[in-house]
């Protein structure tokens, strides 16, 4: 039996984008900082890293498709924060953003990591953006790095 898995190290020549929603920027800025930190710690070249900002989480799938379709990137780390409010808006935005991101990844068969927080309140989001529950931006970039490595291994 053979176990095939990705490694948590970049070769240094991977072109990566971090696609970040600006809405709830107090949270998403911290997620983005975590993702950048992870990228650099694991061998990424900052000159091969692009930060792409969109107004909100609903716009993430549209721009993700543009990035993947450009063929300029080896992978994309998607970050956002959708916080429940008093209306059903949260349900619509989180469902469509999640579905759109997954569909784009499958359509282009390219590594995409999902670092979009969906929380009930601001406190939960803060906990996941660098306090009690770690930094989910760092974790999303870590996932992308492993996916990039695994894809290289499977390519042979």
From Swiss-Prot:
Keyword vocabulary terms for this entry: Riboflavin biosynthesis, Transferase
Molecular function in Gene Ontology: 6,7-dimethyl-8-ribityllumazine synthase activity
EC main group: transferase
Similarity comment: Belongs to the DMRL synthase family.
Function: Catalyzes the formation of 6,7-dimethyl-8-ribityllumazine by condensation of 5-amino-6-(D-ribitylamino)uracil with 3,4-dihydroxy-2-butanone 4-phosphate. This is the penultimate step in the biosynthesis of riboflavin.
EC number(s) from the headed UniProt entry: 2.5.1.78
Catalytic activity entry: (2S)-2-hydroxy-3-oxobutyl phosphate + 5-amino-6-(D-ribitylamino)uracil = 6,7-dimethyl-8-(1-D-ribityl)lumazine + phosphate + 2 H2O + H(+)
Gene3D superfamilies listed in its UniProt record: Lumazine/riboflavin synthase
Record pathway: Cofactor biosynthesis; riboflavin biosynthesis; riboflavin from 2-hydroxy-3-oxobutyl phosphate and 5-amino-6-(D-ribitylamino)uracil: step 1/2
InterPro entries, alphabetized: LS, LS/RS, LS/RS_sf
HAMAP family: Lumazine_synth
GO biological process: riboflavin biosynthetic process
Binding site for 5-amino-6-(D-ribitylamino)uracil: 23, 57-59, 81-83, 114
Active site residues of this protein: 89 (proton donor)
Gene Ontology CC terms: cytosol; riboflavin synthase complex
Xref: Pfam families: DMRL_synthase
Protein name: 6,7-dimethyl-8-ribityllumazine synthase
Positions with a binding annotation for (2S)-2-hydroxy-3-oxobutyl phosphate: 86-87, 128
């Amino acid at each position: 039996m053979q176990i095939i898995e990705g490694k948590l190290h970049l070769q240094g020549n991977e072109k990566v984008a971090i696609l970040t929603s600006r809405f709830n920027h107090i949270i998403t800025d911290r997620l983005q900082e975590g993702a950048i930190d992870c990228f650099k710690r694991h061998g990424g070249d900052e000159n091969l890293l692009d930060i792409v900002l969109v107004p909100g989480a609903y716009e993430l799938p549209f721009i993700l498709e543009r990035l993947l379709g450009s063929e300029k990137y080896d992978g994309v780390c998607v970050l956002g924060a959708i916080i429940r409010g008093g209306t059903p808006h949260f349900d619509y935005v989180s469902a469509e953003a999640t579905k759109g991101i997954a569909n784009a990844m499958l359509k282009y068969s390219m590594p995409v990591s999902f670092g979009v927080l969906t929380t009930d309140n601001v406190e939960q989001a803060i906990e996941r953006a660098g306090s009690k529950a770690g930094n989910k931006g760092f974790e999303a970039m870590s996932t992308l790095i492993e996916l990039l490595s695994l894809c290289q291994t499977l390519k042979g």
